[in-house]
């Protein structure tokens, strides 16, 4: 029996099949400029930073009180243990401005250094602090901004002795947050149904519902006022103006993966890298128009949780089981 399809339906199916075929043919990178680095831990790595005074002096933080130090730009790492830090401490974020650095984590953890980490002191946080520290940003001598996992934002100008609220009301549980170049924030609600935008002049969070049927996983800022958004199901969307609330139709680069995308970062104005579960790493050389995959890394038994660039030639990928990858080009190999 022949089945005659309605033409619009036939067109939709044709487009769907074409998209799947194109996805299946995502080219593989001929040269993968990433090198796995051995680190002395099997714990989850959560954040990385380098000091502003010695660019080769870096620090890694993670769960289970993980604190690692490098003196050679991230090639080799050594464990640093701090007295008084509980074994189950969750060190979520680290940031430096010059020689001054900060580490924020849970439960109610805030560490401070004035000498590139040679000495760390613990700063007591008020038990009434809404939520737990999720992100810390060093801003200059004595100054830093801290965000909790319910969207409370606080700033200090005196080395952490006093903190001043920067937002009138928190927003409830969030799972991911990113800070923009001028102090803006994009935060994703814990269930991924909403995202929120904060700008310093507003003192409030503005909510936006998800536009896709898939929940939001993560968000971040791009060059020149742009932003990216990762949805569950390996979707990516873009906007040229992160304050507009208007996004492109979601893309699904690559074949239909069982692993989702978890984080992304721009290397420069046009090179975009996306990481995800199952050692997923894809790259776009043109801001999201075309894509290629780093299939060579798929044998690494870890999820890639985050990626960060400190300049076009210095980048790192962090993941579970102590997984660390370093960007390697002809200039820093």
Swiss-Prot record:
It comes from the Bacteria. Gene3D superfamilies: YVTN repeat-like/Quinoprotein amine dehydrogenase. Part of early PSII assembly complexes which includes D1 (psbA) and PsbI; not found in mature PSII. Binds to the lumenal side of PSII complexes. Interacts with YidC. Its main location: other. Keywords: Photosynthesis, Photosystem II, Signal, Thylakoid. InterPro entries: PSII_CF48-like_dom (IPR028203), WD40/YVTN_repeat-like_dom_sf (IPR015943), Ycf48/Hcf136 (IPR016705). GO terms for biological process: photosynthesis. It is found in: Cellular thylakoid lumen. A 7-bladed beta-propeller torus, about 55 by 55 Angstroms, with a depth of about 25 Angstroms and a central pore. SUPFAM superfamilies: Oligoxyloglucan reducing end-specific cellobiohydrolase. Residues 1-25 form the signal peptide. Belongs to the Ycf48 family. GO terms for cellular component: photosystem II; plasma membrane-derived thylakoid lumen. A factor required for optimal assembly of photosystem II (PSII), acting in the early stages of PSII assembly. Also plays a role in replacement of photodamaged D1 (psbA). Assists YidC in synthesis of chlorophyll-binding proteins. This is Photosystem II assembly protein Ycf48.
């Amino acid at each position: 029996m022949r089945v005659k399809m309605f033409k619009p339906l036939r067109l939709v199916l044709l487009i769907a099949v074409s998209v799947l075929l194109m996805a299946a043919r995502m080219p593989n990178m001929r040269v993968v400029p990433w090198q796995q680095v051995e680190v002395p831990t099997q714990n989850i790595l959560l954040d990385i930073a380098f000091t502003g005074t010695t660019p080769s002096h870096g620090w890694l933080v993670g769960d289970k009180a993980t604190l690692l130090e490098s003196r050679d730009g991230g090639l080799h790492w050594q464990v640093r243990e701090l007295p008084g830090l509980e074994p189950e401490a969750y060190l979520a974020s680290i940031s430096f401005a010059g020689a001054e650095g900060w580490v924020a984590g849970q439960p109610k953890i805030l560490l401070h250094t004035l000498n590139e980490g040679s000495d760390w002191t613990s700063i007591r946080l008020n038990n009434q602090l809404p939520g737990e520290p999720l992100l810390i940003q060093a801003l200059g001598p004595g100054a830093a901004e801290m965000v909790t996992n319910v969207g409370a934002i606080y700033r200090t100008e005196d080395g952490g002795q006093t903190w001043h609220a920067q937002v009138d009301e928190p927003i409830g549980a969030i799972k991911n947050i990113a800070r923009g170049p001028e102090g803006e924030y994009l935060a994703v609600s814990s269930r991924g149904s909403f995202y929120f935008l904060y700008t310093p002049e507003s003192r409030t969070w503005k909510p936006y519902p998800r536009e896709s049927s898939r929940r939001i996983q993560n968000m971040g800022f791009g060059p020149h006022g742009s932003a990216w958004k990762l949805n569950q199901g390996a979707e990516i969307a873009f906007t040229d103006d992160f304050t507009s609330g208007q996004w492109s139709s979601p893309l699904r680069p690559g074949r239909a993966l069982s692993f989702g995308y978890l984080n992304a970062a721009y290397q420069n104005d046009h090179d975009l890298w996306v990481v995800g579960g199952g050692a997923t790493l894809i790259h776009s050389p043109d801001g999201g128009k075309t894509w290629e995959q780093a299939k060579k890394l798929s044998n690494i038994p870890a999820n890639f949780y985050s990626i960060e660039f400190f300049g076009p030639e210095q980048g790192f990928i962090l993941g579970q089981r102590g997984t660390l990858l370093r960007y390697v080009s002809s200039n820093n190999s």
